[in-house]
Each structure stands twice: as structure tokens, then as C-alpha cells.
A protein has these predicted regions:
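Residue-level recognition of tetratricopeptide repeat
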Residues: 42, 76, 109, 142-144, ...
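Alpha-helical repeat scaffolds
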Residues: 56, 84-96, 117-129, 151-164, ...
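Structural motif corresponding to the intra-repeat A-B loop/turn of tetratricopeptide repeats
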Residues: 47, 81, 114, 149-150, ...
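Terminal, low-structured helical/coil segments at or just beyond the last alpha-helical repeat
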Residues: 249-261, 504, 516-557
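N-terminal leader/linker segments that initiate helical-solenoid repeat arrays
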Residues: 21-91, 98-102, 122, 241-242, ...
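Alpha-helical adaptor scaffolds
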Residues: 143-144, 440-498
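TPR/TPR-like (Sel1-like) alpha-helical repeat modules
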Residues: 95-99, 128-132, 212-236, 389, ...
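Generic helix N-cap/helix-start motif at coil->alpha-helix transitions
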Residues: 29-37, 49, 64-71, 96-106, ...
């Protein structure tokens, strides 16, 4: 990796943001030998041992105090590893104008943590090494500074955020939170509801922060209204409110607001497959607001999905039961274990969570996820049945149709179709307009040649409700093929392939249909496309077609 690669990636990521829409490892002893230390630091970073990399770079920075590159690498590695004390100590030795994006973010976070909002704003508005402008973050900090002082002009300050800025999608939630800080719950309510509607994956977090703000204003009714939803975190927050306590996890100062914004932006960048900056933002958020409840969950998730499972598990297992988002930490822990094929450990942990006195339906659903991953479909269906019983008894958790759909799917994979059909029909009765349910039940019937008229009707309705869903379009085309309308099927399957060319099942279906009408060259092209992403057992079937042509023995089911 060239010496400028890290800086360039930071510049690119922050430029996109500014203009966009919407457990440490033990460090072995090492000798300070100049070039060898540099090589060791880079190797440690590539190996994911950022703590060791930071210490090696820091030692090298002591030897070469004039090197901006070495200092920058040391600070970056320290921040990414979570050693913000080391990063701050190193940053203090450099002119602030030379510091890179990550260091400037940390310095701003440090000033906010100390209650020095003016200094934080000045840091963000100042020039950054590499030429990246962090000024787009400053209006939010300045608005929170005014809100903390009871200055109603805070709300107007938010208008300084450009409409195309990455901060813009989060203005509603911060505007509502600032109004609550200013003691204006009635004015805050409609804005709070808009914020919830736009929150996406962060909905539970936003709801809880707003509920805490309303409770701080002694508005219990509006606080409870903020906590509508089936997530366990919301259920736990409601329990606290109903006992007369605030749920906590509030956002009512500049440090908390800055941290929450960084966490939200880290999710955006992670979805855009930007690797280094989301980790920096999460670590800076944790420093600026050490009690930010979702920060350790996001950190664990990021580490786990970036091949650092042991560090992820240390972080996730450190999330206390008093954290409203501890169920999310448990979910992430299980996913992390499954990702690295530690299935038995994942099952043991999931069963332990499900055996807790306050276990809920989500805990049983988590057990089902692990069992399904292990191919134990009957046991997974049993766990989902227990989850369904808990929800039907009034507990929190997924909607009943979701659990019935999942349970039906597990029973179908276990070749217990009669029982699967009962669960799937129940899901349909509970969610008659849901395209996923309609498609699953219709396709399952289609595969078995059962009541083909109704099967096609179900799939056609699903397709009408979700015309952009490639899998459902594929189901419709396959139904048409099974009913003998091959030319119509080819047109529909071509539409499905255009929507998602990477789906092996779609390409195989298209190939079978094309071969049936003698378009063998095009069929081979579709089958070859299917081979790219097909699973092993499907590959064997497709390879047979490529070798011998379509036969009843190798036709798609």
C-alpha cells in the first residue's frame, strides 16, 4: 500500500460526506530499529492488530519527530484501535493545521467532552491536512452549544447546514431534540415524528432518545407515544417509563449530538463500503460521549464484519444488561460467531440468552437462526414456535406473520410440507398483502405441483405488489413456464434477469425456458451466468445441462 493511500481514502470518504445527499491483542516486545519498526507497524496494521501498529508507529514518531507521515499513521492507528489517549498525546505534538481528518475529529470530540463547544467548532472549521473541509459538521455543534445555553436561536443555526450535506438527513431528529432541550415538547412532537419516519435502521435509537427528552420535560404521554414498536429495546424503555423512570440514552448536549451524528454517518459509510472512516467515527463517538449506548454495538458489528472477530467479541460481551441495546449486542455476537464458523459456540451462547429469566421471543428467534445455519431445520422450527407462543401471549418480538413465515420455511426445508403449509397459510392470513408471504407460499406450491391455479394467483399478486423484486418476478416467470406458456415465461424471466443478473436461480430458469423453445445458444449463455454464483449442488445440475442439454433429470425444480 502506498504511503498516501490511507490519506486519500479519508479525503474521498469525507468529500463524499460533505457533498452527499442523504479487546486489544497483547502487544509483544519489539526493538526500535527504524525501517524494521516501520515495516512491523505496517504489517501489524494489515494483520488487523491496530494496537500494536499504533505503538510501533508511536515509537517511530519519537525517533523521527519531524515526520508528518509517521505521526499521521501513529495517530490514525491509535484512534482506530480505540487508544484515544495515545492519539491525543501524539496529536498534541503536531501543529493542528498538519493534522489529518481523523485527528481533527478526535480533537473536536475531546473539546466537546470537556464542554468546550466553541473550540470544537473552531477545529472543525479550520483547515485540515489533506485539504478536507470538516466545516459541514460545525453548524450542528454550534446549534447544540446554543441549545445548551437555552438560546432559542439554536434552531435557526441548523439552517446553515446545506441541503445537500450528509448532515441534512439528520436535522429533524436534532431539531426535535434541541426543542426538547429548550423545554418545548409540543413544538417538538411533529418534528420528532418526521425524524422517526426517516430514521431507517436507527428507528429504535431515535425513538428512545426522543422519549427520554419528552420525559425530561415531564411529558409522559408523548414519551410513551415515541416508544411504539415491537423491538425489545423499545419494550424495555416502555417498562422504565411505566415505572416512572426515564429510559436514559438521551441526547441533550453537544457531545452527545456530535457522537450520535458520527455514529449515523458511520452507518452510511459502511453501507457504501468505505472501510477505514466508519471505524474512526465510531471510536471518536465513543470518546466524545462514553455513554453513547449504541456505540459499542456498532463497533462490535464493524470489527466482526471486517475479520476481527476476537476483538468484536470482547467489545460485544462488554455491553451490560442495563444497556437498552444489549439484545442488539447479543444478535451481533451470534452473527460474528457464525461468520467464522464457530457454530457450536454460537448455539451455546444463544441458548444461554434464551434461558435468561427475562428472555423474550427474539431470544428464541436467535436460537432458530443458529439452528437453521447448522441445518437443524426441525429444531429451528421448534424454536420459532416457542417465539410465536411468547408473542401471542403479549410479549415483544417480531410480528406473528414473520415468525409463521420463518417457521414455515424451516419446516419446508425439513421436508415436512404438511406442517409447513399450515404455518405459511397462517402467515398469509395475518399478512394477506405481503408480497414475501404471497411469493413464498405460491412458489412452494408451484414446486410441488399443488393447486397450480392458486399458486400462480398468489405469485401474480406478489409481483403486482412488488414489481421491482427480481426474485418475485422470477417466480412469476417460472409459474408461467410450468403452466406451459413458455414465450410469456421467457419475457418475464428476462425481466427478472435484468433486475438482478447475479441470481443463479433466475439465470437457470431462463436457460431452461430458452432451451425448451430451441434457443440453445442463449440457454447456454444463461446457464453459464448461473454457474458464477450457484451453490455446489446447483452447479452440478447446471454443468450437466451444459454437457448434455436439458433433460427431465437435470431440469430446475
Amino acid at each position: 500500500m502506498a504511503p498516501t493511500t490511507r490519506t486519500c481514502s479519508f479525503v474521498l470518504a469525507l468529500s463524499l460526506l460533505a457533498a452527499s445527499p442523504a479487546g486489544a491483542k497483547r502487544t509483544p516486545a519489539f526493538e526500535l530499529t527504524g525501517p524494521a519498526t516501520f515495516v512491523g507497524a505496517r504489517a501489524a496494521a494489515l494483520d488487523g492488530d491496530l494496537r500494536r501498529s499504533a505503538l510501533l508507529y508511536a515509537a517511530l514518531a519519537e525517533q523521527e519527530p519531524g515526520s508528518t507521515v509517521i505521526a499521521g499513521r501513529a495517530i490514525s492507528a491509535a484512534i482506530a484501535s480505540g487508544d484515544t489517549k495515545l492519539a491525543l498525546r501524539l496529536a498534541a505534538k503536531r501543529p493542528i493545521s498538519e493534522l489529518e481528518v481523523d485527528a481533527k475529529l478526535l480533537l473536536a470530540g475531546e473539546e466537546l467532552r470537556r464542554g468546550k463547544e466553541g473550540k470544537a467548532s473552531a477545529i472543525l472549521r479550520g483547515q485540515t491536512g489533506g485539504g478536507v473541509d470538516l466545516g459541514f459538521l460545525a453548524p450542528l455543534v454550534e446549534a447544540w452549544r446554543r441549545a445548551e445555553k437555552g438560546d432559542a436561536s439554536a434552531i435557526g443555526t441548523l439552517s446553515e447546514v446545506p441541503a445537500g450535506s450528509a448532515v441534512a438527513p439528520y436535522l429533524s431528529e436534532h431539531r426535535a431534540l434541541m426543542l426538547l432541550k429548550l423545554g418545548k415538547p409540543v413544538e417538538a412532537e411533529p418534528i420528532a415524528r418526521r425524524a422517526i419516519a426517516a430514521a431507517g435502521r436507527r428507528e429504535a435509537r431515535v425513538r428512545i432518545a426522543l422519549a427520554d427528552g419528552f420525559m425530561r420535560n415531564r411529558d409522559r404521554e408523548r414519551a410513551l407515544a415515541m416508544l411504539e414498536g415491537r423491538e425489545v429495546s423499545l419494550f424495555r424503555a416502555r417498562q422504565l417509563l411505566q415505572s416512572g423512570r426515564r429510559p436514559g440514552a438521551g441526547i441533550d448536549n453537544a457531545a452527545d449530538g456530535f457522537a450520535e451524528l458520527l455514529l449515523a454517518l458511520s452507518l452510511d459509510l459502511a453501507r457504501a463500503d468505505v472501510r477505514s472512516l466508519p471505524l474512526v467515527m465510531i471510536q471518536v463517538a465513543r470518546h466524545a460521549s462514553p455513554d453513547a449506548p449504541q456505540a459499542p454495538v456498532l463497533l462490535g458489528s464493524f470489527l466482526g464484519s471486517n475479520e476481527r472477530p476476537d476483538e468484536a467479541l470482547v467489545v460485544l460481551r462488554g455491553v451490560g444488561d442495563d444497556n437498552l441495546f444489549s439484545p442488539e449486542a447479543q444478535d451481533t455476537e451470534i452473527r460474528t460467531l457464525l461468520r467464522v464458523d464457530r457454530d457450536q459456540e454460537a448455539l451455546a451462547r444463544a441458548l444461554a440468552f434464551a434461558a435468561a429469566p427475562d428472555a423474550q421471543a427474539d431470544d428464541q428467534a436467535r436460537v432458530a437462526d443458529v439452528l437453521a445455519e447448522m441445518g437443524r431445520h426441525v429444531d429451528a422450527a421448534d424454536a420459532l414456535g416457542r417465539a410465536l407462543a411468547m408473542v401471542e401471549a403479549g410479549g415483544p418480538g417480531p410480528e406473528r406473520w414473520v415468525l409463521n413465515l420463518l417457521r414455515g420455511g424451516e419446516l419446508e426445508q425439513a421436508e415436512r410440507w404438511a406442517e409447513a403449509k399450515v404455518a405459511l397459510e397462517a402467515a398469509l392470513a395475518q399478512a394477506p398483502e405481503n408480497p414475501l408471504v404471497l411469493n413464498y407460499l405460491g412458489y412452494a406450491k408451484l414446486e410441488r405441483g399443488e393447486n397450480l391455479d392458486r399458486a400462480e394467483q398468489l405469485i401474480a399478486k406478489a409481483s403486482a405488489l412488488a414489481p421491482d423484486n427480481a426474485s418475485i418476478t422470477d417466480s412469476l416467470g417460472w409459474a408461467q413456464f410450468k403452466r406451459g406458456r413458455v414465450e410469456q415465461a421467457i419475457a418475464t424471466l428476462q425481466q427478472a434477469a435484468a433486475k438482478d443478473p447475479s441470481q443463479a436461480e433466475i439465470q437457470e430458469h431462463l436457460g431452461d425456458a430458452l432451451y425448451t423453445v430451441g434457443r440453445k445458444f442463449e440457454a447456454r449463455h444463461a446457464w453459464n451466468a448461473a454457474l458464477i454464483t450457484a451453490e455446489d449442488e446447483v452447479k452440478e445440475r447446471i454443468e450437466s445441462k451444459l454437457e448434455a442439454g436439458l433433460t427431465p433429470a437435470n431440469a430446475a425444480p
